[in-house]
Regions:
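N-terminal nicking endonuclease/strand-transfer module with a His-rich metal-binding environment
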Residues: 1-148
Length: 148
């Protein structure tokens, strides 16, 4: 069996264009019962603080007057059922992956409550360094990132 992770972007039927949706998904992915592991929860912030992640994302949007439209992107990295990977190693692998979203605030949460370990990345749609909106995934760009 292969231990290669699968990565996909979540497509929300209700959308990613509201503050409530952004807050809701952040609260869901940070649930302690899903992220609890030896020594504490598998939750990290890249270019943001876990304790204030919603405010950090929103403040970046407000700073650049980009608080409309797509608010966030949700990427999931899943390891196969029975994969030989430690939850901390899975979390670190996802943190490294999140580091490729240069200039973006990313919330990384690893869930261990299912038969397969998987990590969620909630990515701010506004680059905190440039103030530009970033687009990931979609049907027309084959997963490439583009700035607006």
């Amino acid at each position: 069996m292969s231990d290669i992770a699968i990565i996909h972007f979540v497509n929300y039927k209700r959308g990613t264009r509201s503050r409530a949706a952004m807050r809701g998904v952040m609260l869901y992915v940070m649930k302690e019962k899903k992220t609890a592991w030896e020594g504490g929860p598998l939750v990290s912030g890249i270019n943001c603080q876990v304790q204030s992640v919603y405010d950090d994302f929103l403040n970046t949007k407000l700073l650049y007057h980009k608080d409309g439209g797509v608010m966030f992107y949700h990427m999931v990295q899943s390891f196969p059922k029975g994969a030989n990977i430690d939850p901390r190693a899975a979390h670190e692998a996802t943190r490294r992956l999140a580091g490729y979203f240069e200039g973006c605030e990313v919330l990384v949460c690893t869930h261990i409550d299912r038969e397969h370990i998987h990590s969620h990345c909630i990515i701010n749609s506004v680059n905190f360094e440039t103030g530009r909106k970033v687009a990931y995934g979609g049907r027309t760009d084959s997963g490439a990132a583009r700035s607006q």
